[in-house]
Regions:
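Glycan-recognition patch characteristic of GH18 chitinases/ENGases
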Residues: 40-141
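Substrate-binding surface in catalytic domains of secreted glycosidases
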Residues: 85-92, 166-295
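Conserved, mostly hydrophobic/aromatic
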Residues: 76, 157, 220, 261, ...
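Loop/turn positions that initiate beta-strands
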Residues: 29-35
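Short, acidic/polar
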Residues: 54-70, 132-148, 202-211, 326-339
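Active-site groove signature of glycoside hydrolases
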Residues: 77-80, 137-169, 219-233
Length: 371
């Protein structure tokens, strides 16, 4: 015997369903009875997307990607302003991007990183974190650039591969940044490695203290992706189980309204058999993945455990491949997780790999908060 009350409880539907349909929730439902289930209210959420221009000009492809995404973004995150040991900044080429974001109602997040020659440098970070004089110069330069751009609302720190002995110094650095930038009208945020416990070992994790960072910044972006990565064995890039495990640990240390879930906008094509240290997997967009499946008449399957699509094919040279990527189903599963955990929103790495379904799903699920 099925009661309307059972449906309400099972699907977390609003109790007004009873009034709308004029039914006693404690009475059995008749076979064939039609129920009107109103759409759930959209959740307010923030969305950030990194964009990484390289070379001497922003490519037409990246300009198009920014135009496509910005109507559904809170922040277009310019990746990245690389810190130098004297406190100066190596700025990316950004011409046209602030205007595209501003015209669509999005603002700019300046991403400040410890990248050096395309690698995160722990020693570069140490030089910055150990000198308040250099930090003062750095903060002055960040402020000057933010004012020049004119549409910046957030200063976003992406310091990775930090030496373990710099954990406290990094917290103090972020605290000082907040003291400098908040009076000027900016928020500060930080990208954090995906941890599942406070004492998680490893050079990417040890200096990222969730609790302490969460206390001194306005929000964090958890990099919940790259379980499947170019140099590793084939698997989903962001399987929902490990992603949720990271988020649930984070919620024990950081308020939900300060947490952005990280989400990849790409997949990988692995040549089989996988050999550790051998050929790297090819990164490709969800759109390219579906085109490739069509090209090779491959059947796209869906892994319910990982909540991710994949397919296998044999190329023209007889080599076997497996492709893991994202689609509307996998993104909807992540959006459901964001809503269930009441998180601040989602941060994407990175624009430039077409995935139009993602932006449509944002519109269906959320009200994008603007800053």
């Amino acid at each position: 015997m099925l009661l309307l009350l059972n449906i309400i409880n099972l699907h977390s539907l609003p109790y007004p369903l009873v009034q709308i349909n004029g039914i006693n929730p404690n009475q059995p439902l008749q076979v064939g009875l039609r129920l009107y289930i109103p759409p759930m209210p959209k959740k307010d959420a923030e969305f950030l997307a990194y964009i990484e221009p390289r070379g001497k000009a922003v490519s037409e492809g990246l300009l198009y990607a920014a135009r496509e995404a910005s109507p559904n973004l809170t922040y277009l995150a310019l990746f990245s302003y690389e810190v130098r040991r004297d406190g100066s900044l190596k700025a990316p080429v950004i011409e046209g991007l602030p205007e595209i974001a501003g015209n669509a109602g999005a603002s700019i997040a300046m991403v400040i990183s410890n990248l050096e020659e395309f690698q995160f440098s722990g020693e570069l970070a140490r030089d910055i974190l150990q000198s308040m004089a250099v930090q003062n110069v750095l903060f002055d330069n960040i402020l000057t650039e933010a004012r020049r751009i004119g549409n910046v609302t957030d200063i976003h720190f992406d310091f990775e591969h930090l030496p373990g002995d710099q954990r406290v110094a990094y917290i103090n650095f972020l605290r000082r940044a907040g003291e400098r930038f908040r009076p000027e009208g900016f928020t500060i945020s930080a990208a954090l490695a995906p941890k599942t416990r406070a004492d998680q070992p490893g050079e990417w994790y040890i200096a990222h203290d969730y609790k302490a960072v969460g206390e001194v910044v306005d929000f964090v972006l958890l990099m919940t992706y790259e379980w499947g990565y170019s140099a590793g064995p084939p698997m989903a890039v962001s399987p929902i189980g490990p992603v949720e495990e990271v988020l649930r640990y984070a919620l024990t240390e950081i308020p939900a309204n300060k947490i952005m879930m990280g989400q990849n906008l790409y997949g990988y094509d692995w040549t089989l058999p996988f050999v550790q240290g051998g050929e790297y997997a090819e990164a490709l967009s969800p759109q390219s993945a579906t085109n490739r499946a069509r090209q090779y008449n491959a059947v796209i399957q869906y892994d319910m455990t990982a909540q991710a699509p994949f397919f296998e094919y044999v190329d023209s040279e007889g080599r076997q491949h497996v492709v893991w990527f994202e689609d509307a189903r996998s993104i909807q599963a992540k959006f459901n997780l964001v809503k269930r955990l009441n998180l601040r929103g989602v941060g994407y790495w990175k624009l430039g790999l077409p995935f139009p379904q993602n932006w449509l799903l944002i519109e269906e699920n959320f009200n994008v908060v603007r800053r």
